[in-house]
Amino acid sequence: MDRKKIFWAIASVFIAILSIWTVVSQSKHFSFEILMSFIRNANKGWLFMSFVCTFGFIWFEGFALVRMARHFGYKTSAIDGTVYGGADVYFSAITPSASGGQPASAYFMIRDGIPGYAATVALLINLVMYTLSLLTIGLLCMIFKYPLLKNFSGISRIFIYWGIVVLIFLALVFYMLLRKGSILYSICDSLIRLLEKIHIIRHGDRLRIKLKNTMKEYQECSNSITGQTGLLIEIFFWNIMQRVSQLLVSFMIFMAVGEGVNKAVDVSVIQCFVAMGSNCVPIPGAMGVADYIMIDGFKQLVGSNAANMELLCRGMTFYGSVITSAVIILIGYIIRKKVAK
């Protein structure tokens, strides 16, 4: 792991601790005893289902990548896809960019014999669909559950609306990178020239020749999805399932503690608004911002128990998925190391 990854990993732990401390210390109604009581008395079946949904959030992303890899002619399994999804979820959580996990996913895909250009195309398509799926679900939530959005505080609504703007912008950027290989080539070429100037690399001309050949294959791979409406709809479906899995985590937890179906549905909608708003700032995992929006939304449903329920739901939707992803990555890395030997 390079220094940048180490820095953001340490920063993420610090921000996570600070976020949890802020939630606990600033809430007059938070009680560790009440929190533990919620956990002890919760229906274990619903809690188990919340973990299944957490795993689904990872699995569905990986399976979407597997389906694209197979379309490009490269054999890979759903188990391999779980590692790809885990790598993306984990490294996205510890870096300040929502797409920070893509290089980690690409690493495992390349290790499994998928060329870099094909992995890049697959990841870019998935990023577009991942973004569009959240915008689609978010739009439905705004139409059918607008009162929930309206009852957020002004600051939370600013975060949510700005997050929507960022999501639309990112979707357009990812699409342009996918369809216009010349843009990606210019970015890579500029990076090579910069590294040459500061004497980190030599023989930049050789790298540029290799880059041109790679970009030609990249563009051919990208063009191969033109007219493949069925494939794109399928990838969009798997991304919708990934997003739904994430939203259902809070649903399952509310059912586990006996809050009822109506509140469980509403908390899933609030979770969607949190997911959109969390894109408004370049902070690892949107820690702090996501917690603020979530508590603000939970006050509409559980009043003084908002902080306790926020820690339960945030603990599973974010920290639970990060820990699960870390375990998946570790196992996947060890297995690939043994196979390589």
Q: How would you label these PLM feature ranges?
A:
Residues 25, 197-218:
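Short, membrane-interfacial amphipathic segments enriched in basic
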Residues 33-41, 214-226:
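A short amphipathic helical element positioned immediately N-terminal to and/or at the very start
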Residues 224-273:
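Transmembrane helical segments that form the transport core of multi-pass membrane transport proteins
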Residues 47-51, 86-94, 124, 232-240:
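Hydrophobic faces of transmembrane alpha-helices in multi-pass small-molecule transporters and flippases
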Residues 79-88, 118, 265-276, 305-315:
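Alpha-helical transmembrane segments of multi-pass membrane proteins
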Residues 60-86, 90, 253-270, 294:
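Membrane-embedded helical hairpins/re-entrant loop segments and their flanking transmembrane helices
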Residues 1-37, 91-201, 283, 287-341:
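Transmembrane helix-loop-helix hairpins in multi-pass inner-membrane proteins
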Residues 6-7, 41-50, 223-237:
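Membrane-interface helix starts
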